[in-house]
Amino acid sequence: MKIVILDGFAANPGDLSWEGMKVLGECTIYDRTAPEEVLERAAGAEAILTNKVIINADHMAALPELKYIGVLATGYNVVDTAAAKERGIVVTNIPSYSTASVAQMVFSHILNITQQVQHHSEEVHKGRWTNNKDFCFWDTPLMELRDKKIGLVGLGNTGYTTARVAIGFGMQVYALTSKSHFQLPPEIKKMDLDQLFSECDIISLHCPLTPETREMVNARRLGMMKPTAILINTGRGPLINEQDLADALNNGKIYAAGVDVLSTEPPCADNPLLTAKNCYITPHIAWATIEARERLMNIAISNLQAYIAGKPENIVNK
């Protein structure tokens, strides 16, 4: 079997091993693949693995040997799954591999914002503590999480794990979820979307990107939030209208935002969030702990093994 990995660098920049994949067939690994290189590199392949390289209906039509597309991520909108189904091509994804890591990033942003860890460390290194008259100093508001309300937009694996961490901090947890009150643990209360935005101290986004959720965080909803509120996004960049968020931050409509994803990645130089007040941005690394990437690669190998055995797993285009 000919296997082509089109953009393997993000998952494995060199600190992990592809050996488990190589034993499954003739495996060629590219760090990155430009759109115009897809057909040449994938020619003759029965199996393609992609992270962010788009595979569309035209590609599939030009690759008659293609029978399997493995997405090296949970989200699979880079593949035209309907076209793949029409052609009998199996498409799989990697579910739940980074749940703990993403929840950890949610609270990395929350704790950095509420305790201003980065800011105060930088000020210490500038000499401000050394030259201070008191045994301590702070020059920004510091917030305790206990009894604060956190609103989770979505309560899948990552949302639920985030909820458990929040409960550990003594927070009041509310969630937008299709589950009934009776299906939720007593520590998690159900709430509708507008109510979450108007009542919660922290909003964390954990829902998929769909036509309905695109730019769900807009000027109207940001206007509902408390001026002391914090917005966290480790989900999908386009869930937020970035200009509206920048305006809300710059005008003091909300206190701060912590985002790990943007609408375009890498961001354009004129992305308004890059210069927005109290906007903390990490470069889409919530998923990228070594433990999560090891898990991703192991599941990717297992998915292809299952396909070869005639019992494919984690299919997204049944």
Q: Where do the model's predicted regions map?
A:
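N-terminal glycine-/charge-rich "phosphate-binding" loop or analogous flexible N-terminal tail
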Residues: 1-45, 172-174
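Short beta->alpha connector loops at strand-helix junctions that form conserved
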Residues: 31, 72-73, 89-100, 177
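An anion/phosphate-binding loop that grips the pyrophosphate of nucleotide cofactors and donors
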Residues: 45, 63-66, 199-200
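Rossmann-like adenosine-cofactor binding region
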Residues: 55-60, 172, 179-272
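Phosphate-binding beta-alpha-beta segment of Rossmann-like dinucleotide-binding domains, i.e.
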Residues: 87, 95-149, 316
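Hydrophobic/small residue at the entry helix of a nucleotide-binding pocket
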Residues: 158
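NAD(P)-dependent dehydrogenase/reductase Rossmann-like domain
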Residues: 296, 302-318
